[in-house]
């Protein structure tokens, strides 16, 4: 019933939002006589703010048309590699007539970005993709709004998410570097673990950013809500059926508008101040700041519904049972064993001020992946970065991306030196070794991350934590960045970043 009430309210607000937009133009258009009346600028600003507060936000576009590759502008085109009911695998294909540039781009690493299915669209990672395209061939998971998926397509569970990731990795090939941002760190680690257990080739590297691998560490408000409420509470209070005016009518979902309300409720003062600053920017005529506000909230306010089965599975598996770290998670009757991963390098990234995934939650992956050599495990704490700052905005571009780029390049270079060993031969050898050796016991959640951290106490600083015996650091530590203004808590400005991919 709540979903129907929301849709009714949205339909009633639409005419008022349109009226506010038209009135704002009336008071600010240079040819309008109302522009010259006293207070016209303030009236225009007030009506424009009212319009943005009442309007409906559609899914944005990636809108990455061209990027710079080695100083050469190349065209970028989105191509759908795989189209499934709940997700599209999108490739950002780069084109150029410059032979040298084309040859160089062909030799660049391939990256699969697994976007979160947690309320926002994959376009939230636009800045991530734009940066990666400078040095990589890029794919991304573009999750479908559940209200747009007909009931006939069937349910979508967390286990289905794991299968989707496996299918995408197999489609691209094992010579891929996987980057998971926030929520997908858990299913991605599960997907790769199951592939390793089956003797399949695994990705060259795994980069996990701000995800709840072990949600018990430094629990945040998000974690506490999931842990302190029962499974039945979520099932009875946040799951609703899609109204009849959508293709997915009668599908049970966790509505995006509820998730958005939760996002805003975490920092209400910050959002209120941001909107007031937007009003003042319009009054002053500061169009650059006003446009930055629009770009950010066009993305932030565009949300999608989550399949109910997937949402409830995530609550139980990740935040209540902690099945991954406890070694009890099974997918299709097979135990998820991160300790079986041997060939993939691992980089974890955490934000100093992350209020969604707390300190140590992502880093916990190192304590689970005990078969990855110490020299292939890395961790990076991003100074002054909140949750969104680790994958978007200035801190992502200046601090995090150089770390990720050099990490990928290091193990891509290692692959190039090992080309004589084909994936099939490596997989066959791996299966033979697994049959010959004893099963490695599951690592307890409390295990120290000795492969990643030195003996002294780890401090959350900008310096990358190098593994014991590591050689050249992944990337030089960047200077501590100044804290941004409250309106740019999530830095999503598509300013001067150029990409290729």
Task: State where each predicted segment sits.
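Intrinsically disordered, polybasic Lys/Arg-rich low-complexity tracts
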Residues: 414-501
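Catalytic histidine-centered segment of alpha/beta-hydrolase-like enzymes
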Residues: 382-398
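Conserved alpha/beta-hydrolase "acid-adjacent" motif
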Residues: 355-361, 373
